[in-house]
Amino acid sequence: MSTLLDVRVAAIRELTPVIREYSFEALASTLPGFSAGSHVQLHLPNGRRNAYSLLSDPADTRQYRIAVRQQDASRGGSRYLHQHLKVGDRLRLSPPANLFPLHGEAQKHILVAAGIGITPFLAYSQELLRRGADFELHYAYRAGSSDAYVDELRQQLGPRLHEYLSGQRRLDLASLLQGRTLGTHVYACGPQSLLLDLQEQASAQGWSPRRVHWEAFAAAEPGQPFRVELARSGQQLEVAADESLLEALEAAGVEVPNLCRGGVCGQCQTPWLKGDVEHRDHFLSANERTSSLMPCVSRGCGSPILLDL
């Protein structure tokens, strides 16, 4: 596992009643460089590990910045940050990792964000402006709650920014994707409904999957409690309704490599031998699901799961 970074909370800024920006500075030495689209995992004092996109300019590593929306159904990540984290507090984070990079072969970049999904595109925009690249940003938001960075983006991007204010203008992905040249790539970050709509519309219009990119860091949805047995050690675990299998394994001292914690990256792929599994990931093929699961999001839905761990 990569060496964690020791950081201090340098600043906290309220962007909307439910979104706050956090700036972190290194306690010693300097922060590692990163590329647009990177994220870090925060290791919180309450035991939670949450992944957040870096919204800072990749050319400036004096600080890392993230933005966090307070989730109504938070299991301790966003709630802890909003209610307990203060300037001067110390935290540990993972080094930056990038599962959502800009693609160098793209001749044009279409960025699509909804709500807090704007965060990776703040770093994207600064990098693309520096390159002199051809791009446009489509941002759907609700006034007063999920409209973080709108004023900043208007000044920075001008006509490259296309706004979709809830109740006034609808983001129509079918129209947005029509008639685009083969060198165009589209990137999306936002709720599950946005990502599914993008995949459906792009497929219907014949877009190559190589030109369609998305990121999802949504926390695992709760479900029914279930039991797990580890085949190699014989250890048995109870996974609570509001706990992921990955969290239960970590609490039991079983470390599983992971990055996104949202069923996207494939890093935590784990073999399973028997039991009933509800797969909720966006990574495994139907064939792979017969023998592997993603403990960050997958759950048991009947008989206990036997993992090859």
From Swiss-Prot:
Cofactor needs: [2Fe-2S] cluster; FMN
Key words, A-Z: 2Fe-2S, Flavoprotein, FMN, Iron, Iron-sulfur, Metal-binding, NADP, Oxidoreductase
E.C. number(s) listed in UniProt: 1.6.2.-
S-S pairs: none
Domain 2Fe-2S ferredoxin-type per the UniProt entry, residue ranges: 226-309
Enzyme class: oxidoreductase
Claim: Transferase is one of the keywords in the record: no
Pfam families (alphabetical): DmmA-like_N, Fer2
InterPro entries associated with the record: 2Fe-2S_ferredoxin-like_sf, 2Fe-2S_ferredoxin-type, 2Fe2S_fd_BS, Beta-grasp_dom_sf, DmmA-like_N, FAD-bd_FR_type, FNR_nucleotide-bd, MRET
Keyword Flavoprotein attributed: yes
Gene3D superfamilies to which the protein is assigned, alphabetical: 3.10.20.30, Nucleotide-binding domain of ferredoxin-NADP reductase (FNR) module, Translation factors
Cofactor binding: number and manner: Binds 1 2Fe-2S cluster per subunit.
SUPFAM superfamilies: 2Fe-2S ferredoxin-like, Ferredoxin reductase-like, C-terminal NADP-linked domain, Riboflavin synthase domain-like
Binding site for [2Fe-2S] cluster: 260, 265, 268, 296
Molecular function terms, GO-annotated: 2 iron, 2 sulfur cluster binding; metal ion binding; oxidoreductase activity
Function according to Swiss-Prot or TrEMBL: Component of the heme-dependent oxidative N-demethylase (HODM) enzyme, that catalyzes the NADPH-dependent oxidation of dimethylamine (DMA) to methylamine (MA) and formaldehyde. Functions in bacterial methylated amine catabolism, linking alkylamine oxidation to the tetrahydrofolate C1 pool. The beta subunit of HODM binds FMN and a 2Fe-2S cluster, and likely reduces the ferric heme iron of the alpha subunit to ferrous using NADPH.
Subunit structure: The heme-dependent oxidative N-demethylase (HODM) is a heterotetramer composed of a catalytic alpha subunit, a FMN/2Fe-2S-dependent oxidoreductase beta subunit, a gamma subunit with putative aminotransferase activity, and a delta subunit of unknown function.
The family this protein is said to belong to: Belongs to the PDR/VanB family.
PANTHER family: CARNITINE MONOOXYGENASE REDUCTASE SUBUNIT, NADH OXIDOREDUCTASE HCR
Name of protein: Heme-dependent oxidative N-demethylase beta subunit
Organism: Ectopseudomonas mendocina (strain ymp) (Pseudomonas mendocina)
